[in-house]
From Swiss-Prot:
Keywords: Ribonucleoprotein, Ribosomal protein, RNA-binding, rRNA-binding, tRNA-binding. Disulfide bonds: none annotated. Part of the 50S ribosomal subunit. One of its GO terms (molecular function) is rRNA binding. Binds 23S rRNA and is also seen to make contacts with the A and possibly P site tRNAs. This is Large ribosomal subunit protein uL16. GO terms for biological process: translation. Belongs to the universal ribosomal protein uL16 family. InterPro entries: Ribosomal_uL16, Ribosomal_uL16_bact-type, Ribosomal_uL16_CS, Ribosomal_uL16_dom, Ribosomal_uL16_sf. The keyword Ubl conjugation does not apply.
Amino acid sequence: MLMPKRVKFRREHRGKMRGRAKGGTEVHFGEYGLQALEASWITNRQIEAARIAMTRYMKRGGKVWIKIFPSKPYTAKPLEVRMGSGKGAPEGWVAVVKPGKVMFEISGVSEEVAREALRLASHKLPVKCKFVKREEVGGDANEN
């Protein structure tokens, strides 16, 4: 499971998820990507489930990049505990994902295999996603 090695503070505020993703909105490493269309918290377990679904379908061929990291702790109080008396204990880790963020990238497989692998991965995630391709930036090398 993905989680930070160490953190300065054990608990964090929930924060707001307004606007679109600032960075990581294009496919940089691979040829194909899975882009989020809504904002949500994605847990380390959901990221791992999506990764396993992709790699199993690709029969361990190709390469997968995970471009989100669960660095935010979320807390929960035990069951049947009265309100108050402090914030709960850390329960797990989440990655904050905003619309436009490319979460996974794939290369080394055909487009049909990549499309199906990313579709299977998207079913493991709590956000609507879309399949995106890498866009080549710039023109020919011969142009002046």
